[in-house]
Amino acid sequence: MKSVLLIGLGRFGRHLAMQLNELGHQVMAVDRDEERVNECMPFVTNAQIGDSTRVDFLRSLGVSNYDVCYVTISGDFQNSLETTSLLKELGANYVVSRAERDVQAKFLLRNGADAVAYPEKQLAKWAAIRYTANHIFSYIELDEQHAIIEVAVPEDWQGRSIGELDIRRKYGVNILGVKRNGKTDVNISPEIILDGSLTLLVRGENKALKKQFRL
């Protein structure tokens, strides 16, 4: 269980708060809008109304006590940038800030963000791949060069074992798990025979994934 400070309760921030709550983390939610704060109260540990660009307000939250600080302010990049910078100045352990464009990400990373989330960009990429490739069932971007996909077993792999295929050496990707009837097995044995009833969880460089699985 992690302690999380979440600043900015627009649509993305609200959904993030709900997901963090479902995962069992302790969440302190902050927004300057009282209505947004009240809407999030049922699924956060605590919440406060306040201006995150005020150093005295942030200091009162004890930002260094949280494992992760999310900055998910929407519609006001200047506030997001100032908040990110102040969090780091006050000793925040790890700051994840929301960006809508690459230029915003560069400024955030230069001003204290340890990582940047692109909710719209990442969702767009997932939707583009998921709904134009019937054999791809899930897509998770790890960074600009790597991803994890859930994919149908290629026809030329069916009836053969994982060990026989020598997948990592020949194709440059790693099998993380196999999924059958909605259940995932991450204990991968070279003796597993692949067939059309399985899907594979595969990690690799985007170039290798595109080449082998036609993304």
Question: Residue locations for each model-derived region?
Answer:
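Cytosolic regulatory regions of ion transport systems
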Residues: 1-215
